[in-house]
Structure formats: C-alpha cells, structure tokens
Amino acid sequence: MRGVILMFPGGAGDVDIERDGAIRHDNNFVVRTRELWARLGYGVVIVDAIGHKSMRGERSTEAYRQVLREILDYAHTLTDRPLWAMGTSQGSIAAMAVGSSARDGELAGIVLTESVSVVGHSGETVFDARPERVRAPALVVANRDDTCTVAPPSRAPEIAAAMKNSAATVLHVEGGVAQSSNPCSSLSPHGYFGIEKQVVGDIARWMRSVTPQ
C-alpha cells in the first residue's frame, strides 16, 4: 500500500455512512473516486459529518480541530505508510485545517480541490483554516471550467501563497460535464464529473513525486 488518504467531502459533509460500510450519498468527488484510489494502491478513510449534522461553518473552528486531532490519531493506528489529507469544495477547509493542525512530519501532504475561497452561506473559507501553519507539501487543484462562485479557479495561486511555510503547488485542469444546473454540484466541472480518472491520475503523480516509492 502506498499510503492512506483522509477524505473530506464538500457541502454539508454528510455522506451518511451506515454501520455496514454502505454510503448513502456518494456523489461527492472524494467519495465516488474511492475505488480509483484503491486501484492505485491507496487506502481511503472517508470522514463523515458528526451526528449527521451539517458541517457548514464548523470546519475551521477550534472545536473541529480537536476532532481532527482524534481523526489523525486514529489514522495512525491503521498504517505506518504515508498519510495524506484531501478535501473538495467546503471539504478543502477541513483538509486545510488538518494540515495546519498536524505535527511536523505527520502528514505526507494535503490536497485541496476546488477549494472554497469566497465567503458563501457557510461563512468560512480555506483562508480561515490557518494556511500559514501548514508545513506539509500541498497541492491546490483548480478546474478552469469551474463556475461555482465560491470556488473561483483564479484564486488557486492565492491559496497556495497563503501556505507560506509549505511547498505548495498549483495544478490546473480543464473539462467536466454539467449533469446538474447547480454550478457547485458534485456532478459538474466543480466536482470533476466526467474527468475523474484524469484528475485522480494527475493528483497521484504529484503524490508520488512527494513520496517516491
């Protein structure tokens, strides 16, 4: 196994994982690509919302940082391989918070995809999650065809620059299919719908460059 990825879904964060492992809401990019990641040799830990409550506005709070600490500690019981954190849209706020909370050397890197960088209904962005405290390598992925107003691809360089103590890289992609009229839907260019294999492959190449095996 190459490593384990902590996956933080976007939106309200509630994917409704059942006790038997079934996932009721699996449209989100970091959830629906779990099998692609498994084929590439990565274990995946999908982080669900706490008590099925919306995570909007909670991901950058100190209370949630304590939860993230518990998640990191749990992940270390699963593997001694490189540990990653990946989030998409609102979930990128959580991934950024993991990166800024982790101890030195604890994470191999963080991946932020279609990150919320403009304040919307949640009232928080990746800039509220203390990006200056991130020390692990970071990848900011931005789809030039994403038209979600709270995640403009043009701000990707600004997100990377905010992680001033990290070796942060920006990856631009293009394409995707809009199955939903909502530009912030998982089933749109915002969620890499239709280009999942390409995006996962691009991210995986960066990850391998960070931790060659």
Regions inferred by a protein language model and the residue ranges of each:
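Short, surface-exposed "cap/lid" segments of acyl-processing enzymes
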Residues: 1-36
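Short, flexible/disordered intra-domain loops and linkers
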Residues: 16-27, 150-153, 184-189
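Second-shell loop/turn segments in exported
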Residues: 19-24, 33, 53-62, 142-145, ...
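Alpha/beta-hydrolase active-site loop
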Residues: 29-33, 55-78
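Conserved alpha/beta-hydrolase
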Residues: 34-54
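Primarily recognizes the serine-hydrolase "nucleophile elbow" in alpha/beta-hydrolase
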Residues: 73-133
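The feature captures the conserved acid-bearing segment of alpha/beta-hydrolase catalytic domains
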Residues: 109-175
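C-terminal catalytic histidine-bearing segment of alpha/beta-hydrolase fold enzymes
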Residues: 166-213
